[in-house]
């Protein structure tokens, strides 16, 4: 092979190698592009699947469930058809109260991230029950818990978590900025009512499914406040009671009818000798019954019952088994205020059954200790102090606090009646204990027509905490 042939041969081989290398590079680029496209398409497809979108001819809503995984909120979509909670059923017949939940939040909060709270309450949709609570913008066993005995501050917020769980930043969802609040579900969405602002000009912010729908301004400029428990929904309308005015004298009390977050009607009660605060309300056969706190001059509890047009009746529980705290020893009651030890009070509740009444109350007459349920078969209309059932749920030696009612609709339970339930706040810390903070845990019970038991389900936390020493 002469030199020219060698040059041509070597050149040809180099050209072939170069072409092959170019083809390989192009193939590599195409392969990377295809791989990227497949991954992107797969991620998009997975996202669509996780949303689990189903199209119905009727309306649907998305219930967001927060799952605590490595301190990360993961939202799992769950589509469900909406219903209307009619509230037309009567209360279920019951023989006693079965323990439903206990969150142990103070015990857990000694070592875990748990909110400093007060005023917890429970409300149920047709799918779930949630614990609502007013945080102090602080965690237990942390320096910002100092001074949280104060009721009203710009740091307080209404939040909620699954019932029975300790309220923490990892399982709770924000509802509203508030130092007084209420919430309820009409079958289609959550209504929340959060009151915040200065004492002489507070505003209630109404939200429906998380969106602001209306506001209500303080009309007496004297600490506008609401229930600190669930509102009541009947046939798509929800009802709440607000108070504005003195806590130790005649104030102004209004009932609000709300549809999808918008006030459609309101009325002021004509109750010149009554005092209504922190009402515990529930639906019963298409009407709403509220049992409230008289902080002015009554040691028995005032009530107001109204229909969907806000036509109302008022009175006091007549029984000589008194339900407020402080209160005198049981004796002769009154269908008006019982003035003995009538000043001050505590949020509470009762359930009416015809002429009879289940009364929830602290075991102590003078302090927020213990809790018991009493069945007075004639207590709604008669003034004697005879009762036939007493069930203890918190011992006299253990702390209690606020209490309130909530119901489970037939759409949730599958029963043909409205199940009555109640919760009890177990307050710990200041002003009675040597801590820098005030907070509470909660327990709840539901009525059953079967066997129950007397016991004590106390808070159980050992104080003081590290931050208090």
From Swiss-Prot:
| Glycosylation sites per record | 44, 58, 63, 68, 88, 146, 235, 365
Reaction it catalyzes: Hydrolysis of alpha-(2->3)-, alpha-(2->6)-, alpha-(2->8)- glycosidic linkages of terminal sialic acid residues in oligosaccharides, glycoproteins, glycolipids, colominic acid and synthetic substrates
Instruction: Report which residue ranges the record marks as coiled coil.
Output: none
What membrane topology is annotated for this entry?
A: Single-pass type II membrane protein
Q: Which residues lie on this side of the membrane: Intravirion?
A: 1-6
Region: Involved in apical transport and lipid raft association; residue ranges are 11-33
The PTM entry states: N-glycosylated.
Membrane-spanning ranges: 7-27
Q: Where in the cell is it found?
A: Virion membrane; Host apical cell membrane
**Which GO terms of the cellular component aspect does the record hold?**
host cell plasma membrane; membrane; virion membrane
Q: What is this protein called?
A: Neuraminidase
Write down the species. Answer: Influenza A virus (strain A/Henry/1936 H1N1)
């Amino acid at each position: 092979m002469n030199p020219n042939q060698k040059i041509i041969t070597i050149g040809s081989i180099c050209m072939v190698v170069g072409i092959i290398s170019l083809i390989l590079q192009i193939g590599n680029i195409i392969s990377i592009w295809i791989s990227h496209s497949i991954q992107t398409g797969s991620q998009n497809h997975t996202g669509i699947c996780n949303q689990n979108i189903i199209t119905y001819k009727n309306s649907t809503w998305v219930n967001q469930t927060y799952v605590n995984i490595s301190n990360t909120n993961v939202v799992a979509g769950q589509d469900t058809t909406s219903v209307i909670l009619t509230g037309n059923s009567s209360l279920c017949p019951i023989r006693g109260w079965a323990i439903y939940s206990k969150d142990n939040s103070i015990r857990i909060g000694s070592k875990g991230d748990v909110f400093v709270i007060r005023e917890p309450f429970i409300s149920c949709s047709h799918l779930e029950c949630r614990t609502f609570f007013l945080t102090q913008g602080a965690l237990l066993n942390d320096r910002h818990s100092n001074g949280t005995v104060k009721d009203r501050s710009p740091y307080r917020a209404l939040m909620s978590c699954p019932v029975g769980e300790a309220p923490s930043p990892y399982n709770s969802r924000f509802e509203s900025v508030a130092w007084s609040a209420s919430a309820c579900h009409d079958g289609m969405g959550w209504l929340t009512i959060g009151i915040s602002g200065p004492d002489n000009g507070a505003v209630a912010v109404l939200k429906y499914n998380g969106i602001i729908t209306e506001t209500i301004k303080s009309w007496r400029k004297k600490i506008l406040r609401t229930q600190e428990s669930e509102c009541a929904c009947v046939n798509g309308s929800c009802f709440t009671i607000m108070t504005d005015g003195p806590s130790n004298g005649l104030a102004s009390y209004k009932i609000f009818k709300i549809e999808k977050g918008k006030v459609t009607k309101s009325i002021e009660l004509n109750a010149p000798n009554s005092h209504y605060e922190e009402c515990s309300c529930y639906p019963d056969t298409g009407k709403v019954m509220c049992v409230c706190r008289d902080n002015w001059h009554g040691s028995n509890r005032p009530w107001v019952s109204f229909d969907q047009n806000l036509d109302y009746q008022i009175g006091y529980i007549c029984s000589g088994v008194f339900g407020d705290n402080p209160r005198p020893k049981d004796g002769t009651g009154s269908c008006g205020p019982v003035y003995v030890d009538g000043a001050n009070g505590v949020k509470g509740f009762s359930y009416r059954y015809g002429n009879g009444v289940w009364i929830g109350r602290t075991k102590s007459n003078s302090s927020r200790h213990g809790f018991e349920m009493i069945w007075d078969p004639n207590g709604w209309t008669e003034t004697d102090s005879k009762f036939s059932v007493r069930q203890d749920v918190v011992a006299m030696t253990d702390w209690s606090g606020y209490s309130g009612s909530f119901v489970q609709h037939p759409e949730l339970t599958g029963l043909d009646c409205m199940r009555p339930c109640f919760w009890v706040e177990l307050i710990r810390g200041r002003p009675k204990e040597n801590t820098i903070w005030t907070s509470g845990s909660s327990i709840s019970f539901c009525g059953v027509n079967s066997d129950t038991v007397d016991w004590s389900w106390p808070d159980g936390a050992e104080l003081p905490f590290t931050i208090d020493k």
